[in-house]
């Protein structure tokens, strides 16, 4: 759990606002001009942010609900700015797939407190319809265009509470190396020392990535930067209770190789591991060539997600999983001389070496993110 500090509780009843959420004037001023806040209530549960639902009377006389997330300090600043920009980019590309972002900003009466405001959608947390969900996701990947023609994003985005290195780069292998290296630096600070882990990670970055990802642009092939959600597991997907429309939220988006989106579908910790999701996605979006190395690329991409999960949850088994996956890839693409290879972890990975069925966790574990209690947008 983060050290998030809730904004100071203020008496809002005098302003005619019902509810238990301490509404800051900065939030009120961010709403459409002439709006009146009728109620503000804490809503949902989150490991890294405080969340609430606002009921607002618009100038045209209609009532509208908004969802708000807040976080404190410089990490909160980066999270709220990053998520607003990520969700805005997704919304511009596929508006029927994203709750509409409104704005982000800073509280005026609470120190170093930041917020992100978006449309409220009343959603169920049931697994989404695979056909609709995967068709929309593939459309996002196909139709998005990087504004620079490069991989990356114009502001840092976050995976959980940690910022990602998403600086623009024309090379996907170089971009992914920097993305993974930044994740490893964070993980090293949060977890106990493990020299063998650091050694195999360095060889993965120096030898495996150039070989495995470099092959994507061999023989005249060109890799398109696609906008990805970046943190896509079932906890960040919901279905509108009123019409069955599938939405995604809590994004850490950037422009990437589209297969990167499937990294978090690999492990056993989440229900989206179901083969049906991978099958439906690949009916809409082709695997990149060389197709025979698709599973190895997915394993590599999953290493990044597992490293960040380990940073959020020191001592988690996924650190061992990431280590064994890197050992597997090094053995296949950049083997050590006989007798010099590091030993495997005795803790086995979550998926057999011969198959993958999807799903990885977000930075929040199930016990830290009470999905059952949050049937709509959550942090």
Name what the model sees in each region.
Residues 41-174, 178:
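ATP-binding pocket architecture of kinase catalytic cores
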Residues 309-379:
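ATP/Mg2+ or Mg2+-diphosphate-binding catalytic cores
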Residues 33-39, 194-200, 286-295:
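Short, surface-exposed acidic
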Residues 2-40:
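Juxta-kinase regulatory segment immediately upstream of eukaryotic protein kinase catalytic domains
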Residues 172-177, 181, 185, 222-227, ...:
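Active-site Asp-x-Gly
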Residues 23-31, 106-109, 145-229, 240-243, ...:
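An alpha-helical support segment within catalytic cores of ATP-dependent transferases
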Residues 30, 139-143, 324-332:
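C-terminal alpha-helix
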